[in-house]
Amino acid sequence: MALVSIAPLASKSCLHKSLSSSAHELKTICRTIPTLGMSRRGKSATPSMSMSLTTTVSDDGVQRRMGDFHSNLWNDDFIQSLSTSYGEPSYRERAERLIGEVKKMFNSMSSEDGELINPHNDLIQRVWMVDSVERLGIERHFKNEIKSALDYVYSYWSEKGIGCGRESVVADLNSTALGLRTLRLHGYAVSADVLNLFKDQNGQFACSPSQTEEEIGSVLNLYRASLIAFPGEKVMEEAEIFSAKYLEEALQKISVSSLSQEIRDVLEYGWHTYLPRMEARNHIDVFGQDTQNSKSCINTEKLLELAKLEFNIFHSLQKRELEYLVRWWKDSGSPQMTFGRHRHVEYYTLASCIAFEPQHSGFRLGFAKTCHIITILDDMYDTFGTVDELELFTAAMKRWNPSAADCLPEYMKGMYMIVYDTVNEICQEAEKAQGRNTLDYARQAWDEYLDSYMQEAKWIVTGYLPTFAEYYENGKVSSGHRTAALQPILTMDIPFPPHILKEVDFPSKLNDLACAILRLRGDTRCYKADRARGEEASSISCYMKDNPGVTEEDALDHINAMISDVIRGLNWELLNPNSSVPISSKKHVFDISRAFHYGYKYRDGYSVANIETKSLVKRTVIDPVTL
């Protein structure tokens, strides 16, 4: 939650002024605020949870607070030192040859005289092939082939599921679970009720006590399928509980192998926090080693070689984009914002983990820039700025004119221009992609976002703890999800006409749920540190206020249950087979939610970015794979 510094204020009268000030009122407010230079670091305060506070004194004597965040981990010299040879044409030519060979594998499954045709395993071959290219991160090359394969599988799907082949007498758990997951992810109407057929007479999922490798693989696919659950699907909840317990027990018995590593990865990250490029990197390490899951009629070596080449070719593009991003960061004046967290490389990493198609450079860079700005603003509203300054800044941003920054404190002048220039720049890129000017739309999102910050400012200054409903509605906006997603997705080569955009952005259910996950998950990771800084309002504290006698643990359980429900709702909004909006138009908003969720998986990974987040940067951006 972005809450405002309780440092001494130049004037408290500004707090109740309208944020839609006229130019005359804005100038009047300006006269109450002295122009400030950048602050100098002062005495260290008592540490609070994982992040301590530092008291600073600005040039005009105003006492301020700064979060004692660690500095940018990825300096310019390091980024410039990265080297790669995978941008050479020979690697791209080699990849193109392999793409052609993999297409032949797909096509031979569909030809009547193809050597891969087998009525006893033609269904599982197709599903396995689609699942493999997706997990290896190379599916973008085979969209037509994937559709053809899944159309074929779906034509044999029944209320009993599927067997290995079209002539299989009975359905089996492995084929049905993997088929359910894969078909559902592509928008086919498949019911989870098929899983009830794999329960015993007591209504429980049943497996043999021996836990063979084949059975473990089937239960692993059951677990993966259970994560693509929709609201109200009790059988999916039961499948998740059963399969998770089964796999955890299996890990205690089986030897260390590619299968055991795959189980650990899937149990660790699930689906909603298993980012596609991260999964590709992990799956490259285990693919082809597991003889139980490999298909002798499919050349896994060629699939693996292509996956490695594609990973490293994109790595060479990442290097160029990172060099550009670091130059932008320096040229924009961002390093002068010493009060904030600088996580532009980390945000770029998240973007490249969910959108690694070469043509989506604008999305990756736009997302990194926008999230960097949001984070600096969060720290400005949260700790460094006074209420008067922040109200002045918010009103000036609504005027959207560089002259409005003239009366701002010096540090805010720089911040104003970073926002102004970057939003305009991304809008220009969006206009090229969408064929229309989207600036007014973007400004509306930014205005509402900053208004939500000011609402939180009033709560903390007046000591008001809102109801859960008040906090939740405002908090979904102040989470920043909508602001972070809107402009970057409009730079993509995906049409977003107004009737589609309203189903993806505000006021859509998709947008609402994505914002909710970020707000709720962020609160569960940050509320203790926020409270130690005097920032009381969170979903946990507001829920406890509404329900006297509820313990903190009870409140956390309630919020975590809400998150699970919201995730299922978000799954439905993305994959609803009756939706008039294609999955391709919704997927990147959904994946942005996954990226933010990953950042809060273990802790506040945006404040403490030198542990899991650093590992993600190294594994998916810095280090290539070995061919």
UniProtKB/Swiss-Prot annotation:
GO terms for MF: lyase activity; magnesium ion binding; pinene synthase activity
UniProt catalytic activity: (2E)-geranyl diphosphate = (1S,5S)-beta-pinene + diphosphate; (2E)-geranyl diphosphate = (1S,5S)-alpha-pinene + diphosphate
Pathway in which this enzyme or protein is active: Terpene metabolism; oleoresin biosynthesis
Binding-site positions, Mg(2+) 1: D378, D382
GO biological process: alpha-pinene biosynthetic process; diterpenoid biosynthetic process; green leaf volatile biosynthetic process; monoterpenoid biosynthetic process
Superkingdom, taxonomy of origin: Eukaryota
Binding site for Mg(2+) 3: D530
Primary location group: plastid
InterPro entries: Isoprenoid_synthase_dom_sf (IPR008949), Terpene_cyclase-like_1_C (IPR034741), Terpene_cyclase_plant_C1 (IPR044814), Terpene_synth_N (IPR001906), Terpene_synth_N_sf (IPR036965), Terpene_synthase-like (IPR050148), Terpene_synthase_metal-bd (IPR005630), Terpenoid_cyclase/PrenylTrfase (IPR008930)
Transit peptide range per the UniProt entry: 1-36
Any Pfam family matching the protein: Terpene_synth_C
Keywords, ordered alphabetically: Chloroplast, Lyase, Magnesium, Metal-binding, Plastid, Transit peptide
Motif DDXXD motif in this chain: 378-382
GO CC annotations, alphabetized: chloroplast
Bound cofactor: record note: Binds 3 Mg(2+) or Mn(2+) ions per subunit.
Signal peptide: none
Enzyme Commission number(s) of this protein: 4.2.3.119, 4.2.3.120
Entry's localization field: Plastid, Chloroplast
Function of the protein: Terpene synthase (TPS) involved in the biosynthesis of monoterpene natural products included in conifer oleoresin secretions and volatile emissions; these compounds contribute to biotic and abiotic stress defense against herbivores and pathogens. Catalyzes the conversion of (2E)-geranyl diphosphate (GPP) to (1S,5S)-beta-pinene.
Family statement: Belongs to the terpene synthase family. Tpsd subfamily.
Notes on the domains: The Asp-Asp-Xaa-Xaa-Asp/Glu (DDXXD/E) motif is important for the catalytic activity, presumably through binding to Mg(2+).
Name of the protein in question: (-)-alpha-pinene synthase 2, chloroplastic
Gene this protein is translated from: TPS-Pin-2
